[in-house]
Curated annotation (Swiss-Prot):
It comes from Influenza B virus (strain B/Ann Arbor/1/1966 [cold-adapted]). Its main location: virion. This is Nucleoprotein. It is found in: Virion; Host nucleus. Homomultimerizes to form the nucleocapsid. May bind host exportin-1/XPO1. Binds to viral genomic RNA. Protein-RNA contacts are mediated by a combination of electrostatic interactions between positively charged residues and the phosphate backbone and planar interactions between aromatic side chains and bases. Residues 1-74 are annotated as: Disordered. Late in virus-infected cells, may be cleaved from a 56-kDa protein to a 53-kDa protein by a cellular caspase. This cleavage might be a marker for the onset of apoptosis in infected cells or have a specific function in virus host interaction.
């Protein structure tokens, strides 16, 4: 079993410079096709009034219209306030749990336990559903469960001579008590903080698990995984969650809805169901980068009785998104245990950007520790943690390697499992290790698909979803995409399908060389003001794709 020396944690050293592990390329450019904004008056995208649903009351809508728009500085100040308050809430939770040692508070699993308890406590809609279901179960003679309480597994430190271990303890909280503590700390309902945590959990799931079963269930090929970002985000994450979701995730939601509508033809006569379906399609249209993609979504929106033809259209749309990538937001989400350390780290700023320098500097300052499950390698676990924080599951690994000075591996080559420890693996005296991979260079994050060019890629996963805005080629497995292009385009919308397939073919033939994000450079981690831009070197021998013919656990197999 793994253990850790109390006097000094061996985190490993980086023996190579980024230049030694990478080498550069460059080439021609094409302009980005910027997505048009779809904003019909009746479908304005607005903030969630509550974390339980993605609807907006008319009063809140009026309030937003009269509200003064925040400046970038004001936004960064409010974001800083949010992350600091989340850290304060975590400290209060740990005091209540009786876990006061720094090592216990640095533990990623303890942060995740506190986050899950908070999400459960604030999900009033789910709590109400559980209570009603339990009332029915009790009438049938089943055991009564108190759904006013929620709990999680925390880990308490145990010292043994010069070695420290962690032992699991189950701690229960009253939901109302957790909600009150959170609202008091945040000074409001704190919906943005809840969304922030949900996105962090989703990014961790994207990295730790493959989603082959979920893709196959809706008729999509597992190789489209790079379009499946945010697939485990709950609906209550609202507009913030939609920005993080990949195009394939929204396609899968629409296909599932059509499947339900085909089984129950009365479903779309219900105004609430019809509105929800239309909202998914409008969000999908907003994601699309090319007019041909938007036209295909319009065909589906115009269908009076959605069926097999619409599913075929959406399947083609998902395939096109590996060539012409949709708009997917990226952000750095750190465990709230790191936020709790901001005062001690000397992180003296009053502004914080989740897509810029401040989040990356805070990541580098932190000393997060993770439980090691049986067979886990500490360095491999560090790669999982880095990619989780930066939402980089589908980023080109050559870019990540250059930014960190560490050679990144395929998911199936990593000797480690996810961060959640199943009940059957929770034993006394578990080892832990410091997450050691740090940034040597930094670059702003992007929401663009980087559609100027497409280079050559590998197999398994067949495309990337860029996270960092740095000039580089975009990896794409053209052989795999060409296999997808051989499909029937006959039917009611043959012209629309034909145009989309032509666009994909044109992209494949023209975009063979060159770089995306032209002119975007990386910077030394100490260079906050971007005074010395550095061209990112790309080494072709490092694998492009994290999920290449993968053998990782599937999210659907998780035993919570």
């Amino acid at each position: 079993m793994s253990n850790m020396d109390i006097d000094g944690i061996n985190t490993g050293t980086i023996d190579k410079t980024p230049e030694e592990i990478t080498s550069g390329t460059s080439g021609a450019t094409r302009p980005i096709i910027k997505p048009a904004t779809l904003a019909p008056p009746s479908n304005k995208r607005t903030r969630n009034p509550s974390p339980e649903r993605a609807a907006t009351s008319s009063e809140a809508d009026v309030g937003r219209r009269t509200q003064k728009k925040q400046t970038p500085t004001e936004i960064k100040k409010s974001v800083y306030n949010m992350v600091v308050k989340l850290g304060e809430f975590y400290n209060q939770m740990m005091v209540k749990a009786g876990l006061n040692d720094d090592m216990e508070r640095n533990l990623i699993q303890n942060a995740h336990a506190a986050e899950r308890i908070l999400l459960a406590a604030t999900d009033d809609k789910k709590t109400e559903f559980q209570k009603k279901k339990n009332a029915r179960d009790v009438k049938e003679g089943k055991e009564e469960i108190d759904h006013n309480k929620t709990g999680g597994t925390f880990y308490k430190m145990v010292r043994d001579d010069k070695t420290i271990y962690f032992s699991p303890i189950r701690i229960t909280f009253l939901k109302e008590e957790v909600k009150t503590m959170y609202k008091t700390t945040m000074g409001s309902d704190g919906f943005s903080g809840l969304n922030h945590i949900m996105i962090g959990h989703s990014q961790m799931n994207d990295v730790c698990f493959q989603r082959s079963k979920a893709l196959k269930r809706v008729g999509l090929d597992p190789s489209l995984i790079s379009t499946f970002a945010g697939s485990t985000l709950p609906r209550r994450s609202g507009a913030t969650g939609v920005a993080i979701k990949g195009g394939g995730t929204l396609v899968a939601e629409a296909i599932r809805f059509i499947g339900r509508a085909m089984a129950d033809r009365g479903l779309l006569r219900d105004i609430r169901a019809k509105t929800a379906y239309e909202k998914i399609l409008l969000n999908l249209k907003n994601k699309c980068s090319a007019p041909q993609q938007k036209a295909l979504v319009d065909q589906v929106i115009g269908s009076r009785n959605p069926g097999i033809a619409d599913i075929e259209d959406l399947t083609l749309l998902a395939r096109s998104m590996v060539v012409v990538r949709p708009s997917v937001a990226s952000k750095v989400v750190l465990p709230i245990s790191i936020n709790a350390k901001i005062p001690q780290l000397g992180f003296n700023v009053e502004e914080y950007s989740m897509v810029g320098y401040e989040a990356m500097a805070l990541y580098n300052m932190a000393t997060p520790v993770s439980i090691l499950r049986m067979g886990d390698d500490a360095k491999d676990k560090s790669q999982l943690f880095f990619m989780s924080c930066f939402g980089a599951a589908y980023e080109d690994q050559r870019v990540l390697s250059a930014l960190t000075g560490t050679e990144f591996k395929h998911r199936s080559a990593l000797k480690c499992k996810g961060f959640h420890v199943p009940a059957k693996e929770q034993v006394e005296g578990m080892g832990a290790a410091l997450m050691s991979i740090k940034l040597q260079f930094w670059a702003p994050m992007t929401r663009s698909g980087g559609n100027e060019v497409g280079g050559d890629g590998g197999s398994g996963q067949i495309s990337c979803s860029p996270v960092f805005a740095v000039e580089r080629p975009i990896a794409l497995s053209k052989q795999a995409v060409r296999r997808m292009l051989s499909m029937n385009i006959e039917g009611r919308d043959a012209d629309v399908k034909g145009n989309l397939l032509k666009m994909m073919n044109d992209s494949m033939t023209k975009k063979t060389n060159g770089n995306a994000f032209i002119g975007k450079k990386m910077f030394q981690i100490s260079d906050k003001n971007k005074t010395n831009p550095i061209e990112i070197p790309i080494k072709q021998t490092i694998p492009n794709f994290f999920f290449g013919r993968d053998t990782a656990e599937d999210y659907d197999d998780l035993d919570y």
